[in-house]
Amino acid sequence: MNVADAMTPREEVVTVSIPGTREDALEYLQGGAFSSVPVVKDGEDGEEFRGLVTREALIERPDEDQLALLVEEVPTVTSEASLADVARLVRESGHNRVPVVDNDHLAGIVTVTDVIRALANGEIAGTDVEVGPLSTHAVNTVYRETPLPVVQAELDYADVPYAAVLDDEGEPEGMLTEVDIIEVARVEEGEAETGESLADEDDDWKWEGIKATGNRYLPTRNVEIPAEPAHRFMSEDLVTVTRKRTAQDAAQLMISNDIEQLPLMTADDMVGILRDIDLLAAVIEDE
């Protein structure tokens, strides 16, 4: 199955244009439907593809307003490439949305979800591969009462887009993703006081601040994340999978529930996590 058969064609792809500002991309990324947005620019031969703006770029660089400075150059594929080629590229690059570019022009977007959907429908190789060996046994977790800004920091440090939420007994009770966080994040303008302004000494979640060096105010522009507990934003209905289930079974669960990861369970114990990018290994090895 080729990329052209699975991709979203250019006429249906949401893009932003240079010149522009971060708000142009934020209105699409904040809705949670996309993890990145293609950036185009008018050229001598028509519209030219310039790169992607990602959620991560907006969060990591909150003071950058110029769209051109937020653009990342990313690997691309042609419309004639196979979905196995896409699976391999995603595994190597870590980009979930791959621009389809023919002769410097954006022809469409192909995503991890497109490959997973083809796997769920039995349209590509890898359907009968068992998911146990594909899963990751290290699971990123957070406590249910962890403030959401701290959860965001933990996702950044762990370099994963999810966290399983644990209850007071240490049992998984939900899943929280970067999509859940970006949906409630807001860009705030204002003034920040530096120097003597440190966290409350009685704050249970105090993070060590910079040593006080005097008071001054600086104009700031930050991504504000509600300081509320993780459990208020998590998905409570955990959809799980066992080691012996096939890649096609897991793909069908992901597509039907619109999720990107499945806790791997043995009896009542969570022993790993199966992410959509893990399933791509089935497509590659069974090609």
Question: What is the role of each PLM region?
Answer:
Residues 1-287:
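Tandem CBS (Cystathionine beta-synthase) repeat/Bateman regulatory domains
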